[in-house]
Structures are given as structure tokens and as C-alpha cells.
């Protein structure tokens, strides 16, 4: 009896020792996600969250070893509501809790003020915020993983002038840092190309009724209307353009490439909406096809606009940790500045300000409710 007790005790002690050893050889790396997990842009926030989640699952399956320890990646998600005040609070929460890698924010108006907090706390930020100001603040460990407004806006102006062959354009923006910045770049390039901006109207990122500003715009007879804003506004805007008999095309940035556009706008978006998708043509690409299939199997739906980019950047970070032999954001960031990464959505290489070098743009429209690529820049 005494022998059995001693034997059981020794076995239990050995098991605890093994467990303790396993824990000692494991290092937790938290990846934060700041995005709109409530409100009209929830669909985008959830998609981005899924991209991060899938990458974390893939990285954990690889059992990356750094400094003799197996890295265990964990996702920590917070709802910034696409609101600057909420986003700054999320940033402070992440910094205070020791999160040193953050994916997001999604909205430029959140990214601009939150980046200061992240930089002060030594946290790496990887954002899809496209306003040029984001990478002009001098933060050393901030990465913009898609093209900026400068490229998206100017490319859409070039498409309007050279492909659609229009002469008169109207501009509407939602007064957000993203929408206004993108519209400014479009208008500036349009004028350089000899197009006439016949009118500029303003709305908000909460509006759904655009009849008044569209009526004003209709009187000026633009051939295209450029909208700087998000899909939850662009879709009803397309519907109301149709109701008013406005025959102009509706142009915009990558947010208008979302599958939410045909869901919310119906057939009003078909061959009317043209958007600047911040990715590459992936038709026929085996890697992109495999990713889409894996994403759909895991989450029951196809990825939206940015989910694949979030996935790529988290995988990029994981590889950089492995290759640099460190989980220190400064060392990992330095490696990412020096070495390009080939992901699902192309190559990720960054300049000294954190802008993605040669970030691709694909102009797309919708046919039968599905996105159709037209041209790449």
C-alpha cells in the first residue's frame, strides 16, 4: 500500500515536471487586431479578424522555434468601431497589456492618432489605412500593407481619363481621413490629366440618404462620380443614382470592391461601380486559389477585400521572427525592411517609411453581382 502511494506520487511529480518543462520551452506571442467589430463596417472587421486567425493557426501548426522556445501565437481582438477615440483607447490597452504586434487599424482616421500610442509603446503596427499621413509621421515600426491613397486615387483618375475617356467628373467624400484623402488625390490627378471637376459634395460615414447631394451633382452632368468612402454608403448611393436617372459611373477605392457592394446595392452596382482593388490579379494562381478554398472551409465564406492581406502580413511576421531569431519588434521590423516576403497577394517589400513598395492596384467592376478585373497598375 505504502509502495503504491510512493509510486503514484513519483509518477505525478514526473508528469508535473514534464508539463513545466514543456511550458518553459514555449513562448506566447500575442497578435492584436484593432478593427470595426461593430457598426456598418463590421463585415470588414470580421474578415480581417479571420485573416489574422487563419494565419495564427497556420503559424502554430509550423511550431516555429526561436531561441530554443516554440512560439505559440495568440489572437487578441478589440473593437475600435472605426472611431478615433475608441481606437486610441484600444491602442493604450494593447500597449499596457504587452501586445507588441497589432494588425490594423482598418480606418485611416483611427490609424493616424493610434499610431502615436503604438509607437510610444514599442508595438509594431501593420495597417490597411491608406491616408498618406500615416507613413509621414516617422514611426519606424509601422507598415502599410496595401497601396496608399496617392496611388489608388491617381490610378482611378488615369483610368477615368484614358480608358473611360471622360471629361467631366464629380467628387463626393464622407469627410473621414480615408474618404477625404482618397478624393483629394483623385481630384488632384484628374485636374492634372485635363479633366474638369464640375462639383464636390460631402456626406458622412453614417449617412444612407444621398438624394440631395446627388440631385445637385446631376445638375452638373458629370460623366463619372468619384466617391471617397466605404461600401455601406457607396451601395445605397449607387441605388439612388439609378433612381434619379444618373447615368454616370461611380468610382471609388478598394472599399468599394467588397462583396458587400452587390449585397447592399443589387443590380445598381453592375457595370456602374468601378473600384481600385489594392491587390494583384490572382486568376489562375494556384496559391491564391488554395488560400480561398482554405478560408472558405474554415469560415464558411469567401474572403472580403483585406482578409488575405492580414493573413499575409501575419505570416510575414512569423517568418521574420524565425529568420531573425527574435520576437523583439525592433529586430523583426528591421528584418522585414530588408527582406521581401512572397504572400498570397504578391510580394511585400517596404521602404524606410513603411510604405509597401510597388503595391499593385487592379481596377474592377461588377457583373452579375461578382467582381470582374479590368486593368492592373
Please tell me what each predicted stretch does.
Residues 19-21:
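N-terminal signal peptide c-region/cleavage motif recognized by signal peptidases
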Residues 2-14, 24-377:
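Extracytosolic ligand-binding ectodomains
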Amino acid at each position: 500500500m505504502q509502495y503504491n502511494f510512493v509510486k503514484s506520487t513519483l509518477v505525478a511529480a514526473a508528469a508535473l515536471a514534464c508539463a513545466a518543462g514543456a511550458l518553459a520551452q514555449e513562448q506566447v506571442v500575442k497578435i492584436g487586431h484593432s478593427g470595426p467589430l461593430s457598426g456598418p463596417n463590421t463585415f470588414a472587421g470580421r474578415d480581417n479578424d479571420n485573416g489574422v486567425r487563419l494565419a495564427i493557426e497556420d503559424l502554430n501548426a509550423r511550431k516555429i522555434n526561436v531561441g530554443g522556445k516554440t512560439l505559440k501565437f495568440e489572437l487578441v481582438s478589440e473593437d475600435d468601431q472605426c472611431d478615433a477615440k475608441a481606437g486610441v483607447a484600444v491602442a493604450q490597452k494593447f500597449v499596457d497589456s504587452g501586445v507588441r504586434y497589432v494588425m490594423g487599424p482598418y480606418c485611416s482616421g483611427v490609424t493616424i492618432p493610434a499610431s502615436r500610442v503604438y509607437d510610444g509603446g514599442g508595438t509594431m503596427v501593420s495597417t490597411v489605412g491608406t491616408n498618406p499621413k500615416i507613413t509621414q509621421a516617422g514611426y519606424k515600426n509601422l507598415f502599410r500593407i496595401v497601396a496608399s491613397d496617392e496611388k489608388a486615387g491617381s490610378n482611378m483618375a488615369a483610368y477615368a481619363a484614358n480608358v473611360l475617356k471622360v471629361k467631366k467628373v464629380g467628387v463626393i467624400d464622407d469627410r473621414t481621413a480615408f474618404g477625404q484623402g482618397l478624393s483629394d488625390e483623385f481630384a488632384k490627378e484628374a485636374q492634372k490629366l485635363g479633366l474638369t471637376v464640375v462639383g464636390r459634395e460631402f456626406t458622412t460615414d453614417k449617412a444612407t440618404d444621398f438624394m440631395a447631394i446627388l440631385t445637385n451633382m446631376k445638375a452638373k452632368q458629370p460623366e463619372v462620380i468619384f466617391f471617397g468612402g466605404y461600401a455601406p454608403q457607396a451601395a445605397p448611393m449607387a441605388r439612388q443614382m439609378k433612381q434619379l436617372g444618373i447615368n454616370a459611373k461611380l468610382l471609388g477605392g478598394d472599399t468599394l470592391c467588397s462583396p458587400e457592394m452587390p449585397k447592399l446595392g443589387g443590380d445598381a452596382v453592375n457595370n456602374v461601380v468601378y473600384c481600385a482593388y489594392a491587390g494583384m490579379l490572382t486568376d489562375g494562381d494556384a496559391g491564391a486559389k488554395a488560400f480561398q478554398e482554405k478560408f472558405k472551409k474554415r469560415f464558411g465564406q469567401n474572403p472580403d477585400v483585406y482578409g488575405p492581406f492580414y493573413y499575409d502580413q501575419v505570416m510575414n511576421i512569423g517568418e521574420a521572427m524565425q529568420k531573425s531569431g527574435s520576437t523583439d519588434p525592433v529586430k523583426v521590423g528591421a528584418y522585414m525592411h530588408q527582406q521581401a516576403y512572397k504572400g498570397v497577394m504578391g510580394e511585400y517589400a517596404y521602404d524606410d517609411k513603411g510604405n509597401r513598395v510597388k503595391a499593385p492596384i487592379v481596377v474592377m467592376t461588377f457583373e452579375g453581382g461578382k467582381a470582374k478585373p479590368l486593368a492592373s497598375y
